[in-house]
């Protein structure tokens, strides 16, 4: 991360970065787990960065949060309960509430993410006050290993597979998660930019393929993430089928997006085939 002459830049490589002109920096804090920065930008409103990478902005957060929740929701036979690992901003929980999920457990490792989101992104973090949401501050990997509860959806709303999130992308975690899924349940994770982070997509896909027989990747356009092309990878013990019931659109998500998001560019298919 760089902040030079009122520009915040996320570096993708030594030769490439995406820069946002900022009005001011609202905070910078080093927690026990990560560095959190918050900026007020001209074009995207408030921007939350963790360890130098963009996590969300006011202007486009809805795309990521709709796609990580609504796609798996409409690919399950039923969705009465959900577990979110990460998601300390509350955006994923908010979408699941809107979808009518009756029980949502949200496990976030860093209390600071929740507190910052409550203050600066209340439209998202107010979801934690909903009666259907149980917020747990703790290690999601340990929670999945220790709990006896099963869920129809498990959503891995984490940072990239480094630091505290690294353990969310391996076979051991997926084995424990499989035991926590209902028979027709789905687990989904963000799996990075296929263009700039193919290893993240490979890591998520391989980890799931080692444990699940049904694994699918889908994509979305998120303008503030590397390249704008972002991948998500889901898995189930059962066949993954799109439901036939009435699909309620979001601001980005709709019935066409649900179908089209699974049509992958050839280079993305080749990344997956190379595993």
Swiss-Prot record:
- From the UniProt record, list the reaction(s) this protein catalyses: S-adenosyl 3-(methylsulfanyl)propylamine + putrescine = S-methyl-5'-thioadenosine + spermidine + H(+)
Single GO cellular component term = cytoplasm
Q: What is its EC number?
A: 2.5.1.16
Q: What class of enzyme is it?
A: transferase
Q: How does it assemble?
A: Homodimer or homotetramer.
What is the protein's known function? Catalyzes the irreversible transfer of a propylamine group from the amino donor S-adenosylmethioninamine (decarboxy-AdoMet) to putrescine (1,4-diaminobutane) to yield spermidine.
NCBIfam families per the UniProt record, alphabetical: PRK00811.1, speE
The cross-references to HAMAP family, in alphabetical order and at most eight, read: Spermidine_synth (MF_00198)
- What's the protein here called? Polyamine aminopropyltransferase
Record organism: Picrophilus torridus (strain ATCC 700027 / DSM 9790 / JCM 10055 / NBRC 100828 / KAW 2/3)
């Amino acid at each position: 991360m760089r902040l030079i002459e009122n520009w915040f830049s996320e570096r993708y490589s030594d030769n490439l970065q995406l820069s946002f002109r900022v009005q001011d920096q609202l905070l910078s804090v080093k927690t026990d787990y990560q560095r959190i920065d918050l900026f007020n930008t001209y074009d995207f409103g408030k921007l939350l960065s963790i360890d130098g990478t963009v996590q969300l902005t006011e202007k486009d957060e809805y795309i990521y949060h709709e796609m990580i929740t609504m796609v798996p929701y409409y690919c399950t036979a039923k969705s009465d309960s959900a577990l979110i690992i990460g998601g300390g901003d509350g955006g994923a929980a908010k979408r699941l509430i809107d979808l009518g999920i009756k029980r949502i457990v949200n496990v976030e490792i860093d209390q600071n993410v929740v507190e910052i989101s409550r203050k600066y992104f209340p439209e998202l973090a107010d979801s934690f006050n909903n009666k259907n949401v149980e917020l747990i501050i703790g290690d999601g990997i340990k929670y999945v290993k220790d709990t006896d509860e099963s869920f129809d959806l498990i959503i891995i709303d984490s940072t990239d597979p480094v630091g505290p999130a690294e353990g969310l992308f391996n076979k051991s975690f997926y084995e424990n998660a499989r035991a926590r899924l209902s028979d027709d349940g789905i687990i989904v994770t963000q799996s990075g930019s296929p263009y700039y982070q193919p290893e993240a997509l490979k890591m998520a896909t391989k980890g799931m393929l080692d444990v699940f027989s049904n694994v699918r990747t889908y994509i979305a356009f998120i303008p503030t993430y590397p390249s704008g092309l972002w991948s998500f990878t889901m898995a189930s013990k059962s066949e993954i089928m799109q439901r036939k019931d009435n699909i309620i659109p979001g601001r980005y998500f709709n019935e066409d997006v649900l179908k089209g998001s699974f049509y992958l560019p050839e280079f993305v298919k080749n990344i997956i085939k190379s595993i």
